[in-house]
């Protein structure tokens, strides 16, 4: 068994904020002495049906606690989702319907078990205690925090000073999230850096109810495949945990070498020593960056799919890109799903040819390939089914990855 100090070092690896060492060591020592695991909580509002790698950063840290033998609760904020988290927002968020929340919650629960051990994970819903509160109990909860304290939040302050409306329900959001920690008797709560204020409210709410305050741990925001912006579906720089192995592999191979190390730190269990060793191996020529990136891609696919699919994705990537001499970085071109589209028309649409006749000549001349295989029929029809993707090459230097939405 790891000592309290060893556990603390592993827990803190890769974190953005940790509050605080002294409290955590006390909790860990008591846990070992009493043989009672700590209560660890991560909450998420089911505001969208699927999660991407950026969301998994904090789930990976939850898995660390699970591996250390602590009790893990994944809280689905079905009540708070109806309010809408105002964190980082400059306007009031629209509230979701109960049906949307329930469907998204089921999807979340299924996806987190690609990382967490389902036998050691408790799924809880905050409506199960908040909806049972009497009006008097709810008012008592709101009395534990002041408007002045809530206005310490930067986004609330900006909106207040600019005259932008703030709904009363938005003030209630951090209070109800904080009360979740009271209900679950949480020892440690995890979240992204954008959740720090809400997590600290939970710490304060526990103290107000006469409980030992939870420790707070936040994880950094993960950069998307562009290496610049936060991973986001709206910026189309994300990898979803439900992406195909082929897409996961291809997208991972497009990231920069420096971002590769960042992803190793936040998305794998390599640890501090392992990460330092990887950097040294590349710097001293023992490993090529491309090899290290392949290992990362295979790790991700193994986690969200299987070892066999990880190997198959590498083999397919090598067949298309390495053996055929295609570059690792091929730009995406999105097209709407259709029953079929002529190859020549698709080439024009993707700006690989100026006209159908030019595309036809390229095809007949053997200058067009789909996933590394030559095509010769200028009248060929391509099935464009949603979710499909393939690399289209025209001539010697024009490449595009067709992604069907």
Swiss-Prot record:
A motif ('HIGH' region) lies at residues 46-55. It is found in: Cytoplasm. GO terms for biological process: tyrosyl-tRNA aminoacylation. It catalyses: tRNA(Tyr) + L-tyrosine + ATP = L-tyrosyl-tRNA(Tyr) + AMP + diphosphate + H(+). GO terms for cellular component: cytosol. HAMAP family: Tyr_tRNA_synth_type2. This is Tyrosine--tRNA ligase. It comes from Bdellovibrio bacteriovorus (strain ATCC 15356 / DSM 50701 / NCIMB 9529 / HD100).
